[in-house]
Amino acid sequence: MNIRSNPDTTLPAVTTGPLPSSRKIYAVPDSAPDLRVPLREIILSEAASEPNLPVYDTSGPYTDPSVTIDVNAGLPRNRIAWVLERGGVEEYVGRDIKPEDNGNVGADKAAKAFTAHHKPLRGLDGHKITQLEFARAGIVTKEMIYVAERENLGRKVQLERAEAALADGESFGASVPAFITPEFVRDEIARGRAIIPCNINHAELEPMIIGRNFLTKINANIGNSAVTSSVEEEVDKMVWAIRWGADTVMDLSTGRNIHTTREWILRNSPVPIGTVPIYQALEKCNGDPVALTWELYKDTLIEQCEQGVDYFTIHAGVRLQYIHLTASRVTGIVSRGGSIMAKWCLAHHKESFLYTHFDEICDIMRKYDVSFSLGDGLRPGSIADANDRAQFAELETLGELTKIAWDKGCQVMIEGPGHVPMHKIKINMDKQLKECGEAPFYTLGPLTTDIAPGYDHITSGIGAAMIGWFGCAMLCYVTPKEHLGLPDRNDVKTGVITYKIAAHAADLAKGHPAAQLRDDALSRARFEFRWTDQFNLGLDPDTAKSFHDETLPKEAHKVAHFCSMCGPKFCSMKITQDVRDYAATLNDPATVGMTISGTIEDGMAQMSAKFKEMGGSVYLDAEKVKESNKALS
Amino acid sequence: MNIRSNPDTTLPAVTTGPLPSSRKIYAVPDSAPDLRVPLREIILSEAASEPNLPVYDTSGPYTDPSVTIDVNAGLPRNRIAWVLERGGVEEYVGRDIKPEDNGNVGADKAAKAFTAHHKPLRGLDGHKITQLEFARAGIVTKEMIYVAERENLGRKVQLERAEAALADGESFGASVPAFITPEFVRDEIARGRAIIPCNINHAELEPMIIGRNFLTKINANIGNSAVTSSVEEEVDKMVWAIRWGADTVMDLSTGRNIHTTREWILRNSPVPIGTVPIYQALEKCNGDPVALTWELYKDTLIEQCEQGVDYFTIHAGVRLQYIHLTASRVTGIVSRGGSIMAKWCLAHHKESFLYTHFDEICDIMRKYDVSFSLGDGLRPGSIADANDRAQFAELETLGELTKIAWDKGCQVMIEGPGHVPMHKIKINMDKQLKECGEAPFYTLGPLTTDIAPGYDHITSGIGAAMIGWFGCAMLCYVTPKEHLGLPDRNDVKTGVITYKIAAHAADLAKGHPAAQLRDDALSRARFEFRWTDQFNLGLDPDTAKSFHDETLPKEAHKVAHFCSMCGPKFCSMKITQDVRDYAATLNDPATVGMTISGTIEDGMAQMSAKFKEMGGSVYLDAEKVKESNKALS
């Protein structure tokens, strides 16, 4: 990996270069030869008697050595042509950037503005704009072709194997197909079961799809808080998060420089960016929830639509009449957006303006194809509060709002908890599917216990794997810093890897046709002592190699038929291979399908003698290995 | 925490002293006032309006400042009196220690022998020796009284609350009672549904129970391999593992000094120690599985029975006729013991001597009350091999052997996988319960995917939580080093904490009457911004505090009503508390059970005005906090 040192030190330095033994490849869909759909090919060692493995690649141009990265200029804006060629949009002079957009930051503390300015696009009345509208009209967009190709992970149609995988899994009623076609994508979007978050102004985007009949996705939250962090750190975190597999990134920045931070992130992000607009709206009224107004909020929506944000978390389900339901909770309201709106509702004794103006919100978002992520402002914040009436009352309202947004032509997903013990997780998934007409579910964890601050990536990774299996479409990561502080770069990586594990475990359990290919490739590498392949096929080759190197650092150990865990004499894989090799030399079917039977006694006696003969020679000398390590260290 | 520096540097240095804000307390059972059952009391801050929280304590005398720890002398041998007073045992001159017991280690590499020598005890013919025999005879032993007290976590009988918790959980047919009595313990042991691993020669033991109607337990594997590690490191790892919550420890040492390492561990261990005797037997024939004999193995069993090992993993289910079933596996046989026995069976073309001599093995183990941990030598080593015929054929044989061992009066648990995707986990649990007559299940993970070497504590923590919920009685930890190298001290801690999370999440989901008390206490601390209480109530107070200190290091921040994650303006818990406090001042029931209704409009208008008045004053100034941090760092 190369850390790019930027000559201008005020600009973000980001990590570029391919992952170990990987190269970027691009698939070209038959139906759209101008598209280049990225994949990462993991290159196996010469000892491998199998092809290289293509895997899903969220990392964007940063891992393509042929692309020159200039954070100052942003990524290529390829997708603008797709939007323009289908028409129905206009370029216009966007809203001016005002001092309050950046929290009235003083000149001394203002972050450097992003250099380039792009005029925004918006939809014209009477024209189709959103992916949902195109899908319903039977039109397959380039975005749909792109994600179809991407979801197949570079494999060709192999119906028999794919169907066997599906039959072996348990998907709880999902309809994962053996192979993803653009038409399948279109159909799922038309039914509201999947979304492609893709603001027409986010031209740097490599489209991806969220829905339970596709690969399970993960989101990484970044963003500064009022207490710590900077623009540079946040852009770096975004690039770092997608390097390890984040499918979308939410910029949850608060405090000053909020507009500028988001601009830098968007112009450099190949993945969808989500935000919670109420955070910025609150900055515009100096942090006083009571002073929030619909006009301030609307202004913020338009500002962020023009920038290119792909999905908005909107807590429109926090209704005045539900707030008292949280009164007896152990941890009250734990959603930032939820608590802000609760305070507003109570202070004014009015229904939430997000609820009363929901129609208008839809009309704005539709013009830019910004997807809804209907926020769960009343999600539980502790095991004690899971699945209570407040939570489910809000979920029912989110179902009602889903249908309104769909009628308006908007794409929708639904946010979910939070903190839920294992036995109450499936109830959440089932109720969400029922109330929200199978709109994609997007949950935060859930944490399955509250007793491990510092390890909430794990308490929640358990719940995330389970709810992903049950049908959740996207899992919002939780880092080790959850409840304790703002995650740094290392926390972001740990959170992303943990959630890639959860998402992949879910895909495996659902029987996703391509999921087990990677497990099997890695298992074969492990069994055949191709250590380097084992590292490189894993989610984090750097960490795997460094752990191995701690005890067996020499290059020769990368082909050794053992590791330091058991040592050479006790390596079960080695012994098993000895057994197999030996059985093969006998070339006698009876040695494989062996039973205790007199008829093959002669063969067995011969086998027995040969084994004795092999004796000690099949093992390496452990003490010698130890000495050689000592000499080296 | 204090790191004990031993004046004699050739002896192990171990970690002593209480955990942060904790003190050791001892409960005295009504029915045995001479027993002192350890608990750890977490002392809450003065701001807490609730009592201190007692939690299960595996750490032994090491965390009791009133006990002087001398690793050279070993722990007090309190339990010897319990064994002697019930009679039926004899002291005798044990087997001599031979050079091959320590792998014929040369004088230059020999570890220092443990100083004290204790003559072993063994059962006399015609007398009851094992907990199973006593239980069946209706006799409640001190061990049973001890574990009953321990399992209740210091709580009194509160039937109503306990029954509500049980009713709220889903235990899949377990029979967890509202309160544990010694008679319940006796009955569960008599039925074979639980075991107390307690060799009569492990007099340092603080007894514990393993069974699905008790708290879910975890095991930590330690032990040197031929390539790395030393006696000192292993004793330190044992003490370190139990400090963080390991309920039992397996010494999986191989290589030289194997007898001496085990002696040091046993004499200093308050938790049950398990081993895999075939590892040492193999050392006695220079690592050649083909040269293994029943006599060598039997000699090893007696050696370890006399030392005080509490449970033996015995791979007696790896039968000759099953070995060919592994031929087409992706990863063959991955159990060390399983592969050793497979090689022996094939080389000799004979049934495994562990199977043919099973009766004799029972007779030996019964005399010392060593529990069986029937090994799963044919467990899957990859997702591809999960739940295959080889695995389940062996499990059926383990069921057959369970009944033989029970007939002989031995306590039994059953080992399980390994590598299993989520949707195939419950099948394992259900089949084990059926085949093995509800004998406790003890699984390694299982790992739910193979694609994350370096993170297998997480891939397996997911599976462990699930199988614990489904009924698994003990979860064998997996560390981040799994498949890559021998775990060090940090890996041991990470593995233990991860598995404490899994076990606790399982207990919560089962509805264990006492499990949620800790979650609720921590959640209340979190909501009330008692930061120090939040850290101390967690599984790893040191890590939680250090994460918090990274961004808010000052003592004043330990009472701040926000953290660096969201900052003061966006802290949902703060806002919620503001809302509640405000509602409380109105002293009007309508403000809690508020609805949109004209009748309380006046109250609401008043509320609205007051909220406006509170305005900006309820928030701390984020920028000021940031500055103060900068000044400090």
Swiss-Prot record, chains A, B:
It holds the Pfam family ThiC_Rad_SAM. [4Fe-4S] cluster binds at residues 563, 566, 571. Residues 1-13 have a biased composition (Polar residues). Its cofactor is [4Fe-4S] cluster. Zn(2+) binds at residues 419, 483. Its EC number is 4.1.99.17. Binds 1 [4Fe-4S] cluster per subunit. The cluster is coordinated with 3 cysteines and an exchangeable S-adenosyl-L-methionine. Keywords: 4Fe-4S, Iron, Iron-sulfur, Lyase, Metal-binding, S-adenosyl-L-methionine, Thiamine biosynthesis, Zinc. InterPro entries: ThiC, ThiC-associated_dom, ThiC/Bza_core_dom, ThiC/BzaA/B. It catalyses: 5-amino-1-(5-phospho-beta-D-ribosyl)imidazole + S-adenosyl-L-methionine = 4-amino-2-methyl-5-(phosphooxymethyl)pyrimidine + CO + 5'-deoxyadenosine + formate + L-methionine + 3 H(+). Substrate binds at residues 221, 250, 279, 315, 335-337, 376-379, 415, 442. NCBIfam families: PRK09284.1, PRK13352.1, thiC. This is Phosphomethylpyrimidine synthase. It comes from Bradyrhizobium sp. (strain ORS 278).
